[in-house]
C-alpha cells in the first residue's frame, strides 16, 4: 500500500514504515505524532486505486517526526566580468524527516 501526499507544497510517495523528508514542520518536536490529511491518491494492497479531487476525504496518514535538520549547503555565486565583483552566498534548507506509521482508509 502506498499513497501520494502533499506536504510543504511538494508531493511525496509514502509507504508504511518508510521515512520521507519534507519542508520543516513548525510547532512539532522530535518523536511527536503528525497527521497528514492532504492525500491525493492511495493504492491499496488489493490493487484498488483511490484518486481525490483534489484530496481524499476518507484517508488519514499517521506518522512520527524522526528529526529536524538542515540539508547540505548550496553555494550561489554572483559574478560581473571586468568589474572585480564577486559574491558567494551559501544556503542550508531546513527539513523534517517523518516516518509513516500507517495509512488508514475509512
Curated annotation (Swiss-Prot):
Disulfide topology: none
One Gene Ontology MF term: structural constituent of ribosome
Tagged with keyword tRNA processing: no
Entry annotated with the keyword rRNA-binding: yes
This protein's UniProt keywords: Ribonucleoprotein, Ribosomal protein, RNA-binding, rRNA-binding
Record GO cellular component, one term: cytoplasm
InterPro entries documented for this protein: bL21-like, bL21-like_sf, Ribosomal_bL21, Ribosomal_bL21_CS
Function: This protein binds to 23S rRNA in the presence of protein L20.
Family: Belongs to the bacterial ribosomal protein bL21 family.
This protein's name: Large ribosomal subunit protein bL21
Amino acid at each position: 500500500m502506498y499513497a501520494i501526499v502533499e506536504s510543504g507544497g511538494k508531493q511525496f510517495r509514502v509507504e508504511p514504515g518508510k521515512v520521507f523528508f519534507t519542508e520543516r514542520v513548525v510547532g512539532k518536536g522530535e518523536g511527536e505524532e503528525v497527521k497528514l490529511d492532504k492525500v491525493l491518491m492511495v493504492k491499496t494492497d488489493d490493487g484498488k486505486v483511490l484518486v481525490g479531487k483534489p484530496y481524499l476525504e476518507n484517508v488519514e496518514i499517521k506518522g512520527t517526526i524522526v528529526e529536524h535538520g538542515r540539508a547540505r549547503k548550496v553555494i550561489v555565486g554572483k559574478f560581473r566580468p571586468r568589474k572585480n565583483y564577486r559574491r558567494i552566498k551559501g544556503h542550508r534548507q531546513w527539513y523534517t524527516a517523518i516516518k509513516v506509521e500507517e495509512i488508514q482508509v475509512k
